[in-house]
């Protein structure tokens, strides 16, 4: 995937009341999206190894930006990712050179997310971008993850994230809005103090 002009896009959308910001406000600054796959599903979807996914979006306490914490679990230890998201109106799924980030993703309006390789903003290495379809007014989302996901294999974020390959069957995940309790681990145990407000 290409590199999204994320900082500019985030700045442009931060001043407007986007559907993402409106939904976050209605949820008290927190939105949890979750999905689990049982053995029957996996047996009918050959190649898929992801069994569970959680996306937690919270409003930064100081900047007001939508911050992202995610968990993708399948074979081996889960992958935990950290970044931020922004609403895009008409230019979703476009990189810095106006290139298409993911050819399988068709909507042009929705949520664009950017992952980091650390939780304090000091790393110069980018963590990757991916588009997210906003479904039924935020009652569900469909994430088109990159083929290499920046993240940690534990809750320890003292070192920079590594890149973990995702197969084609694991990259598109549809999650439903869930009670905040389903993302409690991400909220309370995964980089709980991180804000990225100085980036």
Question: What is each residue range found by the language model?
Answer:
Residues 29-30, 82, 110, 180:
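Disulfide-stabilized extracellular ectodomain repeats and their linkers
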Residues 27-65, 126-135, 177, 196:
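Short, solvent-exposed loop/hinge segments that bridge or flank secondary-structure elements
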Residues 44-90, 146-152, 164-171, 182, ...:
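N-terminal glycine/threonine-rich, aromatic-flanked beta-hairpin/loop signature
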Residues 65-145:
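Contiguous, well-ordered beta-strand patches that form the walls/edges
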Residues 122-199:
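Glycine-rich, aromatic-bearing surface loops/beta-hairpins
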